[in-house]
């Protein structure tokens, strides 16, 4: 049951990366309190929900920039208010253990339906 709920949340996040997503919105969709949702999400994914959303936005933005899109347009599309805000989020990056955990979740196919 929890796996399906978390997968639905991850799918929703992935489909709405260019929109504002709040933790309250996600926990309401999942039917859990904010506290319980935070715990479930962190256990399933290995990082807090808002940090996960930021990482996914960064990865998508980097991909689009690599495809020739203008950096400022991509940054704004993914909710970064300024070029500087995007750069700061990009430079900060995930800690090594979070990179390993995120890659592990991705390798198991848990995050993406379409294997993206």
Named regions from a protein language model:
Residues 7-24, 43-78, 103-115:
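Terminal helix-turn-helix DNA-binding modules in bacterial transcription factors
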Residues 34-35, 82-84:
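The DNA-contacting recognition helix of HTH DNA-binding domains
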């Amino acid at each position: 049951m929890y796996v399906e709920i978390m997968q639905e949340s991850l799918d929703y996040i992935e489909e709405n990366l260019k929109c504002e997503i709040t933790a309250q919105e996600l926990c309401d969709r999942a039917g859990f309190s904010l506290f319980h949702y935070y715990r479930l999400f962190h256990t399933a994914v290995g990082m807090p929900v808002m940090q996960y959303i930021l990482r996914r936005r960064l990865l998508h933005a980097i991909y689009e920039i690599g495809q020739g899109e203008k950096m400022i347009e991509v940054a704004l599309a993914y909710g970064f208010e300024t070029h500087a805000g995007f750069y700061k989020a990009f430079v900060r990056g995930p800690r090594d253990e979070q990179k390993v955990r995120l890659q592990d979740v991705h390798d198991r196919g848990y995050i993406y339906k379409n294997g993206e």
